[in-house]
Amino acid sequence: MALHQFDYIFAIAMLFAFLDAFNIGANDVANSFASSISSRSLKYWQAMVLAGLCEFLGAVLAGARVSGTIKNNIIDSSIFTNDPAVLMLTMTSALIGSSCWLTFATAIGMPVSTTHSIVGGTIGAGIAAGGANGVVWGWSGVSQIIASWFIAPILAGAIAAIVFSISRFSVLEVKSLERSIKNALLLVGVLVFATFSILTMLIVWKGSPNLHLDDLSETETAVSIVLTGAIASIVYFIFFYPFYRRKVLDQDWTLKLIDIFRGPSFYFKSTDDIPPMPEGHQLTIDYYEGRRNLGTTVSVEDEENKAASNSNDSVKNKEDIQEVDLVRTETEPETKLSTKQYWWSLLKQGPKKWPLLFWLVISHGWTQDVIHAQVNDRDMLSGDLKGMYERSKFYDNRVEYIYSVLQAITAATMSFAHGANDVANATGPLSAVYVIWKTNTIGAKSEVPVWVLAYGGVALVIGCWTYGYNIIKNLGNKMILQSPSRGFSIELAVAITTVMATQLGIPTSTTQIAVGGIVAVGLCNKDLKSVNWRMVAWCYSGWFLTLPIAGLIAGIINGIILNAPRFGVEYQMT
């Protein structure tokens, strides 16, 4: 049985929930992977594969608790007890208001809080339905959420600054490069333990409803968290530590990534058989490529390494340009057309060209060179990038290489946490609509169906794959100088903060948390000009506008529908 007379409301809610989740992926994916991509720890397509997997699993495995908060704690559902269909309409209006604003903000490249958006939409629609008293303003509802918007960025910034400062003084700015590398290899082992413990904590702590872990005792929960971190750290020291020690410290340039599985043998293998490195060979990529040439920088690398690195960069850049040109000649005409003009020309050529057009549209997002766009696409938000980079230190690429491995892990952890936390912004209202449509009752604390979480997770992944680049361009190197060591500190801080918020049932803004971490790491240079405050102001202006605009859209739509004239109703003159 179901309220089939309101099938159209359920259908509309499904559509706008998908649009909302799509824009969550397109807008908020920058929080998870902007640092990894901007620091060159991950290629864009690698980040998108990792994002797709971790965001979806986070949404399905651990997303229910926060979804319940969005659905139950913002609006006082008791006022809808006798009219559950009105709550169904109210939640749909909230989705419409949120998704419309997110679509506009994402299109103009404004990183906004998707949490602000759905909370604003829910508040606006709730006021239109039941007045101001229909909203839970107390600490158990809106007040707690609003407080978290201020507390979370400060907390993330403090954690990021502490983590990066530890890396600076124990690894990055140690005078001896050999000692710096040794310290980095040991520190990473500790950080692997911390990172995997945090991820396990997200799934197990207080019991994830969808995994039925609520009955675990405190002792069992603590043991599972510590044991997972310990196993991950042991695996690191067995396989990864000897591999990276031989590759980076002993400079064995012949090693490939697959040689990690030979890690234990490197503990006993002599370094005498390592062949001399060919002249001009790069042991690692230059993680600062494209940003060194903007101005004179404060560097801890010696001049010989810098010269060799720059020489290798020029060769690599030529190869990259040739590869890009080869790809373009296969899919683009000789005449210089904009992307949209070329797509339009393919559309007009008929159905034979449509498969190619479909592929170009789908792959457009993950084929973007976002680092080039961050550095070279100048606009009023870019500010003085040259001056900002001049005030930042460029650390040795071999040390950064070690951090790049760890950054991929923290990015995955943060992505999992992001999927768990932010999918609620779309699935919470949709779950309420579905339960009412199916049962014609409100239900005090109904469980969010797994299919709703999966539906939101799929939309979120599609959004980050196809349109996430538009937001990533505005973060990363446009806000501070990014590198693996900096990005790792940011991502670990954001993951910790998001994990805490998710398990406490507080839907925080991962956008604000991420920016808080980015700004704090930038300020570790002890220079205010090492942060692009224009971009920070752009982010904050988006957060300031989001809640009222989303609320206004949702409130107007819900108010018009609820108070619209109807057949068979007699209206009195007043």
From Swiss-Prot:
One of its GO terms (cellular component) is plasma membrane. It is found in: Cell membrane. Induction: Transcribed under conditions of phosphate limitation. The chain crosses the membrane at residues 6-26, 44-64, 85-105, 118-138, 146-166, 185-205, 223-243, 355-375, 399-419, 448-468, 504-524, 542-562. Residues 1-5, 65-84, 139-145, 206-222, 376-398, 469-503, 563-574 are extracellular. It comes from the Eukaryota. One of its GO terms (biological process) is phosphate ion transmembrane transport. Keywords: Cell membrane, Membrane, Phosphate transport, Symport, Transmembrane, Transmembrane helix, Transport. Residues 315-332 have a biased composition (Basic and acidic residues). Optimum pH is 9.5. It catalyses: 2 Na(+)(out) + phosphate(out) = 2 Na(+)(in) + phosphate(in). Sodium-phosphate symporter. Active in early growth phase. Belongs to the inorganic phosphate transporter (PiT) (TC 2.A.20) family. This is Phosphate permease PHO89. The gene is PHO89.
